[in-house]
A protein has these predicted regions:
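Structured aminoacyl-transfer and RNA-binding surfaces used for tRNA recognition/handling
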Residues: 15-291
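Cysteine-rich micro-motifs
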Residues: 2-10
Length: 291
């Protein structure tokens, strides 16, 4: 009976002040740790090997500097089929840094530049007959996680079709919307970029590939926000920093003052693995210097 997909300018956040995930009273790192463990444990109990996260500096790739998604851990070597996956199927919670939304940080109340992408991946291959699960079972696992583990009302979950592409691959995808917030994206990756491809997605040509890959992304911080119900995601993820900065700088509750803790967290995330981030052209371009 919905008139919108749940993620439009007409849809408000229904979880603000009324969390859609109950039973989580923690905030900050304690909440993230508990939420992360609940996710990983769910998939580990369902036959997925738990992997340690990869570095946020994508040293194994020559097309990107930063790890921007969990699937980036496996592109291009595993997704192309040249290298076997480290486990199959697998689950991981991958720290990411993504600067494309930097202008929206602090304005929307939900955008982040550093975040963790919880995920479960499966690598199916037609030529070898290796098959784990595909679309139906992927959606079933997602639904079970949301309803049985996190107690979300199933009537509040909306699955929105929206093709995905990135890193030379593409596929059909479902965005998972609850309470006006996109919690996850389920990608059914079976296409590879090719100049003679017959399938066009977002201006690029693709062709079918031998592998059929389950590529999912669940926003850890967004799950935490949905469990906390704070006015913005920043009070959930950085509660101590927000309180300290408001007190010391005499900030009021305006959202645009809340991006400072996130900037600090992103900077520390980049410096820790050995990369210095330097802005060379304000608002337009970033340069990364490996140390």
């Amino acid at each position: 009976n919905r008139k919108t997909c749940g993620d439009t300018h007409l849809d408000s956040y229904t979880f603000i002040g009324s969390p859609i995930i109950s039973g989580y009273k923690e905030r900050g790192s304690a909440l993230k740790e508990r939420m992360r463990e609940a996710f990983l444990d769910f998939f580990e109990k369902r036959g997925h090997a738990r992997l340690k996260p990869y570095p946020v500096i994508a040293r194994w790739r020559d097309d990107i500097h930063l790890t921007i998604a969990s699937i980036a851990d496996f592109q291009p070597h595993v997704t192309s089929g040249r290298t076997p996956p480290p486990a199959n199927p697998l689950t991981i919670s991958q720290p990411c840094i993504r600067l494309t939304d930097v202008a929206a940080v602090g304005r929307s109340g939900r955008h982040l530049t550093t975040f963790e992408m919880m995920a479960h991946h499966a690598f199916n291959r037609d030529s070898t007959g290796e098959y784990h699960y595909w679309i139906d079972n992927c959606v079933r696992l997602c639904d079970e996680l949301l309803v049985e583990t996190f107690g979300i009302d199933p009537t509040e979950i909306t699955y929105v079709e929206n093709p995905w592409s990135g890193g030379g691959n593409a596929g059909a995808a479902l965005e998972v919307i609850v309470g006006g917030l996109e919690l996850a994206t389920l990608v059914f990756m079976d296409l590879e970029e090719h100049e003679e491809g017959e399938i066009e997605i977002k201006g690029l040509k693709y062709r079918q590939m031998d592998q059929k890959i389950i590529d999912t992304g669940y926003g850890l911080e967004r799950f935490c926000w949905a469990a906390a119900g704070t006015p913005t995601i920043y009070e959930t993820v950085y509660p101590e920093s927000v309180r300290f900065l408001r007190k010391m700088a005499k900030f009021d509750d305006r959202i645009d003052s809340l991006d400072i803790p996130l900037d600090i967290d992103t900077l520390l995330g980049v410096l820790s693995p050995g990369v210095l981030r330097m802005r060379v052209e304000f608002g337009r371009r970033w340069v990364y210097i490996a140390c």
